[in-house]
Design a protein with these regions (language model features):
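A structural-propensity feature for long, helix-poor, extended segments
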Residues: 47-87
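Short, non-ligating residues that shape and space the ligands of small metal-coordination modules
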Residues: 167-168, 188-189
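Cysteine-rich micro-motifs
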Residues: 173-185
């Protein structure tokens, strides 16, 4: 595994800047990988799926350290608004969820009271012990075959809009195969 400094440099380059969320995300992912015994996530990239629970700076850092990407189907996003990630070892079936403790912010303030919030958190998050920053929990994650990297499933066509649907994401409603948008789950509306 790379050093904290190396991962912070890579993460800042990918994300566009270094911030407290990047430091926390790098530390969170390093802990998750250590717990699973994955030392080289690049060499073992097909062994890991990571579920992230927030769409903030932390997630970019987790993706860099764990070498997981949405486009490789190894990074899964659950919009729960939590600074947490679950690391699933596909080889062993083991999974660990690592979540930032809310008390870590106060620990950072106490460690560096002379610094502004952002600078204090960056510095403290790089130095505080894992047990002060994070809760970890061994969990069980059932990953359906269609969510695995490399899955090659059937492609179907929506009976209403005619768009293709991959990875068993279709909905059957009143006997018709529909995409989620046409089935009423759209996140957008036509701009008339």
């Amino acid at each position: 595994m790379k050093s904290l400094a190396e991962y912070l440099e890579l993460s800042a380059k990918t994300h566009g800047h270094l911030c407290a969320g990047q430091v926390l995300g790098v530390r969170l992912a390093m802990l998750g990988l250590r717990e699973l015994g994955i030392d080289d996530p690049v060499a073992e990239r097909k062994r890991l799926i990571t579920y992230v629970e927030i769409d903030r700076c932390v997630t970019d850092a987790v993706g860099v350290v764990a070498n997981c990407r949405l486009g490789k189907r190894a990074l899964k996003f659950r919009d729960w608004g939590k600074v947490a990630a679950t690391f699933v070892d596909l080889k062993t079936g083991r999974a660990v969820r690592v979540a930032a403790k809310e008390s870590s912010k106060q620990a950072a303030r106490e460690m560096f009271p002379e610094l502004d919030k952002e600078a204090g958190q960056q510095k403290a998050y790089a130095q505080l012990p894992d047990e002060i920053l994070f809760d970890k929990q061994w969990v069980k994650v059932e990953v359906p075959p269609e969510d695995l990297p490399g899955f090659k499933g059937p492609r179907v066509v929506c009976a209403q809009c005619g768009e293709g649907i991959n990875f068993k994401r279709e909905v059957v409603k009143n006997g018709r195969t529909l995409c989620r948008s046409c089935a009423g789950e759209a996140y957008y509306k036509p701009a008339d």
